[in-house]
Every structure is written in structure tokens, then in C-alpha cells.
């Protein structure tokens, strides 16, 4: 049986004020005298009071909650994006309502329907591919939406990210410039950004008069996936002398396999990844990677979303934060 929670009246009785005074303090402490603030705060702590958001939600007032839909909770990329988001939402008194959907648009639809039922004030997304019902629900909700991770694909409202195509093209060009000619693209998940990077890789190969070659798997990205992908690439493409991977997990796995086989990196095999994870930056040789502003992207995305919630105009609609090529020692 649930224990009865302290209510506003309990706090008011403890301090000797009206329930409305406590309510004003919870909404905005500045509306209450300095002398009362300390007393109310102490009473809240002593009683273990937990605010009830249901009345605000039912009255269509602000919930001070931001919905965040992520395709994965195990991917370090999104952990860092979330850290950036919450550095801003926490500072402004907003709660993040988090859900993940395993890169499945139908599951994203279910998660979104649940989130919207809580009257969230805004929504943060990281993918551009959605079901028709998801798009309709977002339209009907009429709340501000920010999409992260990509600054080029069409967005629903506003976006903060970087150019995945150009990042992949430039990294592939850097590998080619170091004398490698038989370069394969290793991809996992087959999500939209993986495909965009593949196109950037292919453009660089074609621009150099080289033949593009991709090895892709649908399962999630991991070190073991990187091992399996480079094994497959070497079987199917014996002259292989370089790989560009959709992220650092695959690249690190490929490096482990080269080490096992006694292949020298980069002399026998060039290896490059994406996102600049810490493990790749402490390897020897240091992994070449595209460094992306993940935490900054989350914080700026959250700042722009809160501005939209306040009714402010946000420009540009799509903000490109750029990327940095880090050649390391592996290409």
C-alpha cells in the first residue's frame, strides 16, 4: 500500500502560511519574501515533499518537461548529447523525459505518444525518419521541436548538427591523400546517417577515380562488428588497404583484428572512424577520426528549444556546428 505523501497544506501548516504562498514559492521563489523562502524550503526538506505535476498537466499549463527521444542508450554519442541537453534544462528548471526506441520508427511512435500524453513543453529528436503517425502527432501537438546530429537534411522545426556527408567525404579524401587506393566503407545499423556517410565516402572515391566498396550489417555497432566487417571486407576484397568506418566502435574493432593478424597500421591498413571516442584517441597509433561536437550540440539544441518555448524567434533554422578531422596516426 502506498504511503500518503505530504501535500501543499502540510507544508503550509508547518510554516504558518497559506497553501497559495507555498504554491507561489514552488512556481517562482522570487514571488515570496526572502524571510519566507528559507522557512518554506526547510519545511519542504523536512517533510520530503514531492511536487505533483498532474494539476498543471490537466490544466494545459506548462509542464516544464522536455521530451528527449534517443535511438540508443548504450551508444556513447547519445550519452554525451544528453549530458549537453541536461546541462541546460537543469539550469532552467526543466525536467527531461527520456525514452529510447532502438532505431525502430514504430517504437519511436509509441514512445512519443506516451510522452505527449504528459503535455511536454518541447521535443528533442536525433533522427529524421519517422512514421506518418509520428509526424501527425507532432503537428497536432504544436510544440517546438529541435532535431540534432544533422545540419543538412530537412527538419520539422529547427535543427542543430553538422554535415555528415561532407565529414565522410573529407575523411575519405584524407585517406586517399596518404596513398591508399583500395578503401572500403564499413557500416552498421543502416540508419540514415550511416547511409549519408556512405554517400560522402563514395563521392570522395569517385572524385579520385577509385571504385567504392561497402560492407554493411544491420546489427548494432560494436567492436566485434568491426572485427567481422573487416574480415568480410578482406575476404571479398583481397587488395584492401584501408577502411573508413561509420563510427569509432567499428574502427577500433578493425584495429584489433589487424593487430591479431600482424598487419601494420597504417602501412598495411589505414583505419579511420567517426566521432572521436576516447578509446580511439588513446590507442597506438592514435585512431584517425571525425571529431563531432556532441555535448555542445546537445546544449545549444536545448538552448534554442527553450527559446522557442518562450516564443522567441530562432535563426538560422538549421545551425551547423561543424566538425574537425583528426588524422591521428592510423591513416
Swiss-Prot record:
Name of the protein in question: HTH-type transcriptional regulator GntR
GO cellular component: cytosol
Metabolic or biological pathway: Carbohydrate acid metabolism; D-gluconate degradation [regulation]
Function: Negative regulator for the gluconate utilization system GNT-I, the gntUKR operon.
Keyword field contains Transcription: yes
Residue span(s) of domain HTH lacI-type: 6-60
Superkingdom of the organism of origin: Bacteria
GO molecular function: DNA-binding transcription factor activity; transcription cis-regulatory region binding
One Pfam family this sequence matches: LacI
PROSITE patterns membership: HTH_LACI_1, HTH_LACI_2
Annotated region of DNA binding: 8-27
Alphabetized UniProt keyword annotations: DNA-binding, Repressor, Transcription, Transcription regulation
Source organism of this protein record: Escherichia coli (strain K12)
Annotated GO biological process: DNA damage response; negative regulation of DNA-templated transcription; positive regulation of DNA-templated transcription; regulation of DNA-templated transcription
Organism ancestry: Bacteria, Pseudomonadati, Pseudomonadota, Gammaproteobacteria, Enterobacterales
Amino acid at each position: 500500500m502506498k504511503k500518503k505523501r505530504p501535500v501543499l497544506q502540510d507544508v503550509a501548516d508547518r510554516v504558518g502560511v497559506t497553501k497559495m504562498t507555498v504554491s507561489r514559492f514552488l512556481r517562482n521563489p522570487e514571488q515570496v519574501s526572502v524571510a519566507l523562502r528559507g522557512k518554506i524550503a526547510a519545511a519542504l526538506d523536512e517533510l520530503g515533499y514531492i511536487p505533483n505535476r498532474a494539476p498543471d498537466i490537466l490544466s494545459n499549463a506548462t509542464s516544464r518537461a522536455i521530451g528527449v527521444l534517443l535511438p540508443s542508450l548504450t551508444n556513447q554519442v547519445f550519452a554525451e548529447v544528453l549530458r549537453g541537453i541536461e546541462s541546460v534544462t537543469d539550469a532552467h528548471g526543466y525536467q527531461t523525459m527520456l525514452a529510447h526506441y532502438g532505431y525502430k520508427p514504430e517504437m519511436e511512435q509509441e514512445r512519443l505518444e506516451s510522452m505527449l500524453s504528459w503535455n511536454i513543453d518541447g521535443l528533442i529528436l536525433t533522427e529524421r525518419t519517422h512514421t506518418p503517425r509520428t509526424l501527425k502527432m507532432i503537428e497536432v501537438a504544436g510544440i517546438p521541436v529541435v532535431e540534432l546530429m544533422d545540419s543538412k537534411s530537412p527538419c520539422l522545426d529547427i535543427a542543430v548538427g553538422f554535415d555528415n556527408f561532407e565529414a565522410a567525404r573529407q575523411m575519405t579524401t584524407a585517406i586517399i591523400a596518404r596513398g591508399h587506393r583500395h578503401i572500403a566503407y564499413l557500416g552498421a545499423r543502416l540508419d540514415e546517417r550511416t547511409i549519408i556517410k556512405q554517400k560522402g565516402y563514395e563521392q570522395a572515391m569517385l572524385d579520385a577515380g577509385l571504385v567504392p566498396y561497402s560492407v554493411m550489417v544491420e546489427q548494432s555497432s560494436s567492436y566485434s562488428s568491426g572485427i567481422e566487417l573487416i574480415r568480410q571486407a578482406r575476404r571479398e576484397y583481397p587488395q584492401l588497404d584501408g577502411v573508413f568506418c561509420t563510427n569509432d566502435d567499428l574502427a577500433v574493432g578493425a584495429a584489433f583484428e589487424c593487430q591479431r593478424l600482424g598487419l601494420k597500421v597504417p602501412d598495411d591498413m589505414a583505419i579511420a572512424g567517426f566521432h572521436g571516442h576516447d578509446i580511439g584517441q588513446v590507442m597506438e597509433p592514435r585512431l584517425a577520426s571525425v571529431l563531432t561536437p556532441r555535448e555542445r550540440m546537445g546544449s545549444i539544441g536545448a538552448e534554442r528549444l527553450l527559446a522557442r518555448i518562450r516564443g522567441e524567434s530562432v535563426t538560422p533554422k538549421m545551425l551547423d556546428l561543424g566538425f574537425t578531422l583528426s588524422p591521428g596516426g592510423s591513416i
